[in-house]
Amino acid sequence: MIDLNQSWPMPDRPLPIVIFGAGSIVMDAHIPAYLASEFVIRGIFDPDQDKARALAAQYGFTAYRTAQEAAAQQDVIFDLATPPDAHAEILESLPEAAGVLIQKPMGSDLAGATEILRVCRARSLRAAVNFQLRFAPMMLALRDAIDRGLLGEVVDFDAWLAVDTPWGLWKFLKGLPRVEILLHSIHYLDFIRSVLGDPKGVHAKTLGHPSGDTSNTRTAAILDYGDRVRCALSINHNHSFGRKYQACEFRICGTKGAAYLHLGVNLDYPKGEPDILEINTGEGWVACPLTGSWFIDSFANRMAQLQRFVTGQEPTLVSGVEDAWTTMALVEAAYESSASPATPLAPKP
């Protein structure tokens, strides 16, 4: 058994949290994760006052009547679980130098991300984007293994999904021109950047499926890291032929070892399956017992790192808006690549 770090230390002086948004991700992940880690939620605001009041009554915190009332809170961390096009306006209203967690994506496109970055710079906000996959126990353990040299130099990274995602759960997706990469595979692209650094570019194709009207649910992408590192993603959310051959896996190979990851939440969503991490350093595959899962443990780890940065316990903010902007640039490049023609075959002479 390999003993690897799987959690982020909690802040010594945790700050209360004010949440914007009372949607399903807040109900199912943010609130349960924060309370399980003994963070205090001071209050919540949502334009749907009934939803906000129901959560406030259930958990014993305040439901603010207006966004302005929520934004006026002092000495808190603001958690923006809001639609991407709403982020910038809320950020403009927050106190100078506030600590903020912004729901991914960082805007609906790169222009939106650039506006969010401008606001955060202008108001000196200590803002991170909620790319919480980096903070999943299995990914923290993988990061620890890589940092300790167990895999050597990482030279191959494969992300392979063949799942049956219930897109109908999210009514707001109907009519959106960008779905799969912007709202799902963005997690994988961000995590890949955290391991391999920034690619030189990307070749990508994203498309929908004849069975539904969601704009894009399948993606193939190759990230260009030069002549030494290979990175490819094959993403299919329409594999509706039973569990037997479905998969949600990362295979990461280095010059000394390899890692296999099974991302359980995407299989039988939203119930999911347990995550799996196995590592092979030359003597066979060894399972790493995991003490939590992507959903919901990563949300508490993500909040803990932000709070430790804001309170001066850590010098670096992971997935801050400066770094997250580059993930958005990669997403934008993938969509631009998909819209561009591929290299054509030569005509037969």
Where are these regions (language model features)?
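Contiguous beta-strand/loop segments that form the cofactor/metal-binding neighborhood of enzyme cores
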Residues: 2-3, 183, 189-268, 300-314, ...
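Active-site loop of classical SDR/Rossmann-like NAD(P)-dependent oxidoreductases
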Residues: 25, 47, 291-304
